[in-house]
Swiss-Prot record:
It comes from the Eukaryota. This is Ranatuerin-2BYa. It is found in: Secreted. GO terms for biological process: defense response to bacterium; killing of cells of another organism. Antibacterial activity against Gram-positive bacterium S.aureus and Gram-negative bacterium E.coli. Weak hemolytic activity. The keyword Membrane does not apply. Disulfide bonds join C27-C32. Pfam families: Antimicrobial_2.
Length: 32
């Protein structure tokens, strides 16, 4: 239903945000 769709969207957004933060963090450590 709509709730599970919303949950899936939220998960995807959280994943993207976490990925972006990880990339920035890696860049600080390894210099990209």
């Amino acid at each position: 239903g709509i709730l599970s769709t919303f949950k899936g969207l939220a998960k995807g957004v959280a994943k993207d945000l976490a990925g972006n933060l990880l990339d920035k963090f890696k860049c600080k450590i390894t210099g990209c």
